[in-house]
């Protein structure tokens, strides 16, 4: 009995899948106008971003296997310079930063790698991936025709390429790396800075080509990429993108599966129907490489998040922050990938013929001697359409594409979701793990304390801390004469200007108030009347960084901390300008200096317990221990009763918490139909931008796990709980 088309198609798909497993064999990687070519075969490549430092090494095999099961061919990752070179010439490639291990795990799964060396990454990552020490190299100007910058970035790029070659990880060596990226979204920066930017683009392309990796280089959002470099598209939609040369394939390096969450912002999400539509439209217009940014977003552990970026980098990705499939997105895209692979022979062999089927409907047909594939599109956002194609009628929902791998049978429609979300809704379930908290109150320093230094005027925060801590103290004394009239009248007004990001003001050891900025407006002004007495008053300003900016120009000019003006209004003489007074400075908190987040450090201070535990007090450390819950479900801390600070598990920093920063925005009913933007579909409005904070299971011991919380604002520790993420 003969095989029908569907049976033949699935056999072909199986052959293609098997061929993708052969990653240990040396292969030649080239390209033409249609596609990337691996060993002489044009390929439609489906890729997903998974950033190795945003998950633990123990999570990597499962994440990559799920990506493979979801129909991906390629794993894409940035290389994170500041994680790998924390000090000049001192390199780190261990634990979450073990890049070689990550790539080998991908290879073992039978997938390819797209390595985005950059080394600028953006990625909502602290300082865009640049090491902070780079800012203080003499003569440094970032990302332009500047010799100190070019020397540093070339040295690091060469270091990474050399490592990859030594481990034989490029495809031409039998490894999985089929593509590399130099720079990142540089086109808009080049346009802004002009001629030096153009010179830098030319230089960086020539430098990359000179490294002889044997695989193609790409530059994303770089319309003037040289002929030897493939320019690619980033965005929510890229069907109208065209490379700058007829001999380059149409590639999409970032199809945004959702959007990042910022502290103070609502949580964005992107409907599965829309992202599937974006992929189908790109393919039907001749696209041959698609990468989902992100396929798994993960977590901004430690202090790796960019300015005001939440600790969760979930991104509404097909695999959620904890590595679990997000439905229906994961399965809906998995089905799409299978159907695209059925169309692959036609897609790589022919250009589409486009035919109108109605006012907002059209057919894109790929036909070769041995294959035919059709994409039927309905761009109407509100009305379904019945279209006639090839002598048959097809019903197309609004804002959708139907795919016919044999030009006859509809195998898939982007708006027809076959997975019921209600049956697999994920939620946080209490583990009933008991906590018994102890507290340690941080001391408020004074201007003459040990460990301080003094100078006239205000200093920029990061130039002193070098981003080794979020915290920096500005200290001075305010001497008030007994004849000041405000002592028997209205309190004076203290006004403080800061470049960001948050500020706690203490007067005579007591919290007088707090101010903080936002991602949109990181600069802040504290303006509040304060209580002063005759004699010497102690003013202590704790400036808090909430990540460093990750996008923009002239990184060397960016500032953080209290830069003024600082004024006191309401004194007898009118206003005192305190900006140029003598100030004392102190780096970090006492608890950090004592390493109270570690087991050894926590034993060096006295913890109050029982009824003496401080509650709703600023600058308080909390300590408890707990046993690991049974099972293997992912775990998180519910921090909804706390304000702002950081958390550690067994000495490892799980990130910044800031549940007291509630989400702005209007969360309204969101339709999949119509052009998507990052502000279209929102959740969590009026609630914490982030309530739950991932606790990796691999960081836990069976018993007696140490949890430490630094609370800046004041919170209720008894409300903290350990929860597990599981299906409803």
Curated annotation (Swiss-Prot):
UniProt key word Glycoprotein: yes
GO biological process: carbohydrate metabolic process
Any Pfam family hit: Glyco_hydro_35
Positions of glycan attachment: 255, 380, 450
Catalytic residues (positions): 185, 254
Gene3D superfamilies the record matches: Galactose-binding domain-like, Glycosidases
Signal peptide: 1-27
A Gene Ontology term for the protein's cellular component: apoplast
GO molecular function: beta-galactosidase activity
Keywords: Apoplast, Glycoprotein, Glycosidase, Hydrolase, Secreted, Signal
Reactions it catalyzes: Hydrolysis of terminal non-reducing beta-D-galactose residues in beta-D-galactosides
Primary localization class, coarse: secreted
Cellular localisation: Secreted, Extracellular space, Apoplast
E.C. code: 3.2.1.23
Tissue: Ubiquitous, with higher expression levels in roots and siliques.
Stated family: Belongs to the glycosyl hydrolase 35 family.
Listed name of the protein: Beta-galactosidase 12
Gene symbol of the encoding locus: BGAL12
